Structures are given as structure tokens and as C-alpha cells.
């Protein structure tokens, strides 16, 4: 990437962080789901899959992820200082060192333990709703029948694979790396992980 392009990215990202989060996740996480469909069904798209609806939903979810990353990356170091670790807030934004690694791990574990299960369940609900609407854009304006979808979710897969396996064995280390990166590229890296998420969702789908 040229210095000019990276400079534009940094300035636009700093001024319009939520817009960039919408675009990053809307594009990259949707591509990840298309890759997941390719793994599970042999095609990148099919009738009823709802690529555009998924892109919009992922964009909105991406803004929520950006918010969560800000809240936890600021709040966890503050709590660590409250518990006695000096300068945790400065260390997480400084050069890479062992202390920064531990803080990044703490941020990742806290965020993925508290936020990720709710996020993953809500994503599954929206995904089911899009499929129930035949992939149509009307899924974006049709009320989600929350009680019905939650009742019929495959909680065995959600708990035993999505929560118990992907969170500790993939998302804890993946987001530890994320929080070691400079602030302006964390959300971009998290969006790139959406490709990996698509693969994981494909594996979960095969476990039904």
C-alpha cells in the first residue's frame, strides 16, 4: 500500500470511523459468508442467500463491533490500573512488549466473554431472518420474530461449537493480535477475520 493511500485511509478512518466500520464489515464479512457457502454448498451465491441483505446487516454489526472494541480497549486497561497495574492505558497504545501482550490478551478475553456470545447469537438470529425472507431486501424492514427464532435455534451447536470452541481457541488469540496492532488498523483486521468467521460458520452448518 502506498504512503498516499495509507495516509488517506488513516485520515478518513479517524474522521469517519463508524462509516468505515460499516464498509469494512459490509464487504469483508459478507465475502467470508460467501466463502463459507462455497465450502458448505459448492457455490458462492444462490437464490435466497441474500448477499445484499447480509452486507447491510454486517455493516450495522460492524459498527457495533467498532463500538465494543473502543469500549473494551479503553475500559479493560482502566480496570487493570484500578486493580494495581501501573500505566496499562499507556502500554496498550505503546510499543510491543510483554506487558502489552498481557493487556491485549485481557482485553480480548473480556470482550469475547462478555460481548461475543450476545453478538454471535444476534447474528444467527438476523441470518435466520434473512433466510426466512428468501434473501429479499424486505428482510431489512420486516420485524424479526425474535421469540420464534430464538426458540428454534440449534443451541447444541451454538453452545458446544460456536461458544465453547471458537471463542477460546480462535477468537481469544485472534483478537489478542488485533489489540496489539495500531488503533487505526484494529477494526480493519477484525473485519478481515470475518473471512475466517465465514469458514467457521460453514463448519457449524455442517454439524447440524
Residue ranges and their predicted role:
Residues 1-208:
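Juxtamembrane/disordered regions of integral membrane proteins
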Amino acid at each position: 500500500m502506498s504512503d498516499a493511500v495509507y495516509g488517506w485511509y488513516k485520515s478518513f478512518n479517524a474522521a469517519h470511523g463508524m462509516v468505515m466500520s460499516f464498509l469494512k464489515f459490509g464487504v469483508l464479512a459478507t465475502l467470508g459468508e460467501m466463502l463459507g457457502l462455497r465450502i458448505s454448498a459448492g457455490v458462492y451465491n444462490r437464490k435466497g442467500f441474500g448477499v445484499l441483505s447480509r452486507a447491510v446487516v454486517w455493516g450495522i454489526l460492524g459498527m457495533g463491533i467498532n463500538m465494543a472494541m473502543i469500549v473494551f480497549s479503553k475500559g479493560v486497561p482502566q480496570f487493570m490500573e484500578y486493580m494495581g497495574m501501573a500505566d496499562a492505558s499507556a502500554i496498550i497504545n505503546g510499543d510491543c512488549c510483554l506487558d502489552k501482550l498481557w493487556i491485549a490478551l485481557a482485553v480480548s478475553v473480556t470482550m469475547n466473554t462478555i460481548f461475543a456470545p450476545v453478538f454471535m447469537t444476534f447474528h444467527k438470529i438476523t441470518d435466520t431472518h434473512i433466510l426466512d425472507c428468501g434473501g429479499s431486501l424486505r428482510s431489512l424492514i420486516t420485524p424479526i420474530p425474535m421469540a420464534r427464532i430464538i426458540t428454534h435455534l440449534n443451541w447444541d451447536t451454538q453452545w458446544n461449537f460456536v461458544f465453547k470452541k471458537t471463542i477460546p481457541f480462535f477468537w481469544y488469540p485472534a483478537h489478542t493480535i488485533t489489540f496489539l496492532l495500531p488503533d487505526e488498523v484494529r477494526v480493519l483486521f477484525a473485519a478481515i477475520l470475518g473471512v475466517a468467521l465465514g469458514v467457521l460458520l460453514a463448519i457449524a452448518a455442517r454439524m447440524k
